Amino acid sequence: MANPDSVTVRKVETQADFKAFFEFPWKLYRDDPNWVPPLLSMRRHLLDKNENPSWEYLEGDYYVAWRAGEPVGTVAAFVNHRHNEFHNEHISWFGFFECIEDQYVATALLDTAAAWGRERGYNALRGPQSFTNMDECGLLVDGFARPVMLMPYNPPYYQRLVENAGLAKVMDTHSAMANWDILHEAGAVDRVNRIADRVKRSQSITVRGLERKNLKAEFELFKDIYNHAWEKNWGFTPFTSKELDALVKSLGSFIDPELACFGYV
């Protein structure tokens, strides 16, 4: 195992630093057939403190671990003030944790994130999370297959690195998957079809597709439904109006109105 003294964790302060942070996953996962790279534009928007509206209530820094002049890991240390207010907690977070299979590097990164929080008076570190619960969150510990959109993916060794660095599980979450054959075998498709038939026959339930000409109003309706439906879920924080505007901008151009439906009772 490498000498820990050869690992240096530095805050991202220059364009070159940011480039190393931004591009590191492509270096780490280049030989992993299950990794699905994010859209460059979406990752850039997510990390840009001037573009991502979530930074209205976030405070944080990015870090890169270096060895022999090469990046070997990344982490973001941040506080989500909106989460703390909504859940009456006093915690900081880590996210965008990516690391070679090296315990020294992982511990150095996570210790840096923990120290960042302690310096600001936060008594616990939680993660990984890509800023909010609406982004990728959680550490994959089982089912290392190609993920669907917005589901986290990481190498199996991450669990060992994180736990050996002193962190412990706070909550079990589940990653979604889309496999038509499994859904059929489980009878899920038949159940959905039966429910759909009952809805069609019902006089008290109506379903309509999204109206593209009123896109902003439709997304505002979605925000109200989403915030109400999820308000008691662990880790949830409500959408803000500016986050909704960003969602309209990112999804509005390619969303299929026939697949985005509203139900009324």
Predicted regions and their residues:
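Conserved beta-strand in the GNAT
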Residues: V64, E70-V79, F262-V265
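Short amphipathic alpha-helix that is part of the acyltransferase structural core
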Residues: A2-N50, R201-E243
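Short regulatory alpha-helical segment in sensory/regulatory domains of signaling proteins that mediates
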Residues: G117, N227, G252-I255
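Short alpha-helical segments and helix-capping/turn motifs at coil-helix boundaries
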Residues: L46-E51, L58-Y62, F78-N80, Y104, ...
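Acyltransferase donor/substrate-recognition loop-hinge adjacent to the catalytic core
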Residues: N3-V7, P155-W234, L259
